[in-house]
Design a protein with these regions (language model features):
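Bacterial N-terminal signal peptides
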Residues: 7-15
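Residues in and immediately flanking transmembrane alpha helices
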Residues: 15-16, 351
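Sec/Tat signal peptide C-region and signal peptidase I cleavage site
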Residues: 17-21
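Residue-level detector of conserved, function-critical positions
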Residues: 22-376
């Protein structure tokens, strides 16, 4: 299960098709382009809205090849022979694989790449977006700022590649909607605080660890080995008492750990969903949160009940998409479900071979697999 909360951040719908455009329908402000709903599976892209391949898998997919979801600009990050590049919605290389690492394109049409230990931002033509190079570069956020590293320090750049906040921090998070970003500037003490848009300390660096502020004005932080929640003045709204804590979701619940188990607390620090779970993710806009118990993972509703039964080895967040990736417990192969837990498309093993099945459990790849299987 992915842990969305990390020291340095690199990186919905309840029904399946209605909000996604047909491939031939122009995207509008309310209708996203069709390729945003495509699912990368077995080296190809499956379109749930049409229940058909948008881009068919290759005849022979290599194990280390990767195909990532399409960005809004119609380009998808892809890996071939150990190098990253970008393909278009026909599956053709728009930017040939040449990078050691890379990110998907952001909404400002820029992507972060690294080659020969040097990081640059490129445009949709694969050209360098600006002259400045970096030790490490990350995706642009909705605030049009990106975290970038110069030597061993981090700062923020704008969409023109200029330093908005000079690189002087040893660790840093993206800015939260309230305009504050968790940061640490001293490698000796590793104390965390919060900076404002000018890079000045809004909340002094005096915490062992600090997380992002949520819409309710609270942020998780730790002191004395325990986690609690700060208000926007840096005071404890919920005193440190948890083994771990994560930012609040939009529904007002934050996951927290006690005695090695995870549950969910409200803004007063009271348990709303008791600590039953071995692993837990944040609640999403569709009201679901991934969780794991006794070795199996599923999705909880806001009452703490299993909305989608714990039946998978691993589950991933929906991330505002109409589908989520899961790992099947019987085969350890990936599959994709909707917010009701129904299969959209999945890999399976038949006759000793890996195949792709649709929602009706029909083999859709390889196309002539059934006849070949019958002969064995």
């Amino acid at each position: 299960m992915k842990n969305a909360f990390c020291a340095l951040l690199l990186s919905t719908l309840a029904t399946l098709a209605p909000a996604w455009a047909d491939e031939k329908t122009p995207a509008t402000a309310t209708t996203p382009p069709a390729w945003l709903g495509w699912i990368s599976v077995h080296g190809g892209y499956y379109d749930p809205a049409r229940q058909a391949w948008a881009i068919a898998p290759p005849a022979r997919a290599k194990k280390d090849d990767e195909r990532h979801p399409f960005a809004a600009n119609g380009l998808a990050l892809a890996r071939q022979n150990g190098k990253y590049g970008y393909i278009d919605t026909r599956g053709k290389w728009k930017i040939k694989p040449q990078f050691d690492t890379a990110t998907s394109f952001s909404n400002n049409h820029l992507a972060a790449t690294q080659k020969n230990k040097t990081s640059r931002y490129i445009n949709e033509k694969g050209q360098n977006a600006f002259k400045t190079t970096f030790t490490q570069a990350f995706s642009f956020g909705t605030d049009s700022l990106a975290i970038a590293q110069q030597n061993d320090k981090y700062g923020f750049i704008d969409a023109q590649g200029q330093w908005k906040i000079e690189p002087r921090f040893t660790k840093i998070h993206p800015f939260a909607p309230n305009g504050l970003a968790a940061a640490s500037a001293s490698p000796a003490t590793d104390q965390w605080g919060y900076i404002n848009a000018s890079g000045a300390w809004a909340i002094a660096a005096k915490y062992e660890t600090a997380g992002d502020f949520a819409a309710n004005g609270l942020a998780p932080a730790s002191q004395g080995g325990k986690w609690g929640f700060l208000d926007q003045r840096g005071n404890w709204a919920v005193a440190p008492q948890f083994e771990q804590a994560r930012p609040f979701a939009a529904n007002g619940l934050a996951r927290a750990q006690q005695n090695g188990k995870w549950g969910y607390v409200n803004a007063f620090g009271r348990w709303v969903i008791p600590v039953y779970f071995d692993e837990a993710d944040d609640f999403e806009a569709n009201g679901l949160a991934g969780a794991k118990q006794n070795g199996l993972a599923g999705y909880l509703n806001e009452r703490g009940d299993w909305a989608i039964a714990a039946q998978f080895t691993e589950v991933s967040p929906f991330e505002n998409r109409p589908w989520a990736k899961v790992i099947q417990s019987k085969t350890e192969l990936p599959g994709f479900i909707d917010a009701r837990g129904q299969w959209i498309v999945r890999q399976d093993r038949v006759c000793g071979q890996t195949v792709v099945k649709n929602a009706g459990d029909e083999i859709i790849w390889p196309r002539k697999f059934s006849a070949a299987c019958d002969k064995k």
